UniProtKB/Swiss-Prot annotation:
InterPro entries: CemA. One of its GO terms (molecular function) is antiporter activity. This is Potassium/proton antiporter CemA. It holds the Pfam family CemA.
Length: 229
């Protein structure tokens, strides 16, 4: 019975690692035809966000400026002007197709992410017993380390998350999440989140050190503060 109880969380741990990847891959493949058909038959002229509309308008303006430039610097025969118009028409059609495909991918990724988060939430709720065992494993492993190694591990983790160079990492991660969910890039929102998350984590860490580590292992707190200085 104890052996079975020890082995039970192992498949659960493997599922936590590989399940998001498997869900994303499978639902992307299965939902793509449906989303493509729905979006194309909807014939929507609405852009999913302002940044997409801005990019498309910029491309159209570039095409228009190229035509005006060609007409200004040289006097082309009518046949050449006609070829330019045909080329611009083809480029416009290609631009619309690319934008349409980008919209489909944004809807597909957003839907897949929502489904993945929902399934993982249910998976965590149903696997409460396995999570308790995994938590006991982590605590046992952590307590078996020396105080110096514990302090070094905490210091390394905090420097990665809330250290001097961490804002750039937070900016990349939040920007990637924004892009994956199809949201428009907003420097003000991203800067606000980057300046807020490290402060919250730093507050939680200090509270944990003061109320938990200081009671469980005072020597660890002393070593941590010495290394941090």
């Amino acid at each position: 019975m104890p052996k079975k109880k020890v082995l039970t969380p192992l498949p659960y741990l493997a599922s936590i690692v590989f399940l998001p990847w498997w869900i994303s891959l499978s639902f992307n493949k299965s939902l793509e035809p449906w989303v493509t058909n729905w979006w194309n038959t909807k014939q929507s002229e609405i852009f999913l966000n302002d940044i997409q509309e801005k990019n498309v308008l910029e491309r159209f303006i570039e095409l228009e400026e190229l035509v005006l430039l060609d007409e200004m610097i040289k006097e082309y025969p009518e046949t050449h002007i006609q070829k330019l118009r045909i080329g611009i028409h083809k480029e416009t059609i290609q631009l619309v197709k690319m934008q349409n495909q980008n919209d489909i991918q944004i809807i597909l990724h957003f839907s897949t992410n929502i489904i993945t988060l929902t399934i993982l939430s249910g998976f965590f709720i149903m696997g409460n017993e396995e999570l308790v065992i995994l938590n006991s494993w982590v605590q046992e492993f952590f307590y078996n380390l020396s105080d110096t190694i514990k302090a070094f591990s905490i210091l390394l983790l905090t420097d990665l998350c809330i250290g001097f160079h961490s804002p750039h990492g937070w900016e990349l991660m939040i920007g990637s999440i924004y892009k994956d969910f199809g949201f428009a890039h907003n420097d003000q929102i991203i800067s606000g989140l980057v300046s807020t998350f490290p402060v919250i984590l730093d507050t939680i860490l200090k509270y944990w050190i003061f109320h938990y580590l200081n009671r469980v292992s005072p020597s660890l707190v002393v070593i941590y503060h010495s290394m941090n200085e």
